[in-house]
Amino acid sequence: MLRVVEGIFIFVVISESVFGVLGNGFIGLVNCIDCAKNKLSTIGFILTGLAISRIFLIWIIITDGFIQIFSPNIYASSNLIEYISYFWVIGNQSSMWFATSLSIFYFLKIANFSNYIFLWLKSRTNMVLPFMIVFLLISSLLNFAYIAKILNDYKMKNDTVWDLNMYKSEYFIKQILLNLGVIFFFTLSLITCVLLIISLWRHNRQMQSNVTGLRDSNTEAHVKAMKVLISFIILFILYFIGMAIEISYFTVRENKLLLMFGMTTTAIYPWGHSFILILGNSKLKQASLRVLQQLKCCEKRKNLRVT
């Protein structure tokens, strides 16, 4: 019975990975076509970077998980876990700072506040956002340098061989340090989401005072952006829970189902958010509908040939 359950978990994880690669690949392809036509916008650049980093992150999650499931001795007898940790940090941080840039973009484009600094930033969104992306990238690189030092110190402490049976407290502390940058970026996204909610609440109060009774375009934009941001926050919390479950597997190595459940939960974030972005972006949604229509036409042609 245990093997059947393991097979189901592996099937689900592989399916999530395939959907994630397809969804993020579609986002990247649509924006790359716009880039070839010299039509790539700021949000297109952010979505492309987010899609590429998510695909990279999916491969790292799957590679790490399958090694732990099928060949855990590889980690104990080599430095592979060190390289996987480096790649995971790169994928995780780049994905997070692109997602944070997207949150800031929605906030500057849609929110309404009378603060002078906010109005100045809002009027120069297309100029400010590239600097913001560079700032997030630099902070990510600085954090990565600190993470590299942590990993290197731990490697030297264990005589160049990673000890997978370390004390629980030491391992959890190391994981918290590795995720400091991600927590910082997530906090920024959470702040922008809260500010968007405040902006929507104020806007609704103004609309009620005008007694229009109708939802204007600004309200629709607020709601659409909030759906994307709130879904991102929920999915990232699931991702973090999945990571915590996978980390706890290092202390309970006999229970592989724990690892598989953690992988399944972790993989929801990179593939689920990609489809939410497609549905929430009019250009991506229209492109996906055209692809589906073409697939239906191809299916009808095949059926006609068979008959």
Swiss-Prot record:
Regions that span the bilayer: 7-27, 43-63, 101-121, 127-147, 180-200, 228-248, 258-278
Domain of life from the UniProt record: Eukaryota
A single GO molecular function term of this UniProt record: G protein-coupled receptor activity
Membrane topology annotation: Multi-pass membrane protein
Location of this chain's protein in the cell: Membrane
Keyword Transferase assigned: no
Record-level GO cellular component terms: membrane; plasma membrane
The UniProt record lists the keyword Membrane: yes
Chief location category: membrane
Stretches of the chain found on the membrane's Cytoplasmic side: 28-42, 122-126, 201-227, 279-307
Pfam families to which the protein is assigned, alphabetical: TAS2R
Glycosylation: residue positions: 158
Described function: Receptor that may play a role in the perception of bitterness and is gustducin-linked. May play a role in sensing the chemical composition of the gastrointestinal content. The activity of this receptor may stimulate alpha gustducin, mediate PLC-beta-2 activation and lead to the gating of TRPM5.
Name of this chain's protein: Taste receptor type 2 member 10
Organism: Pan troglodytes (Chimpanzee)
Taxonomic lineage of the native organism: Eukaryota, Metazoa, Chordata, Craniata, Vertebrata
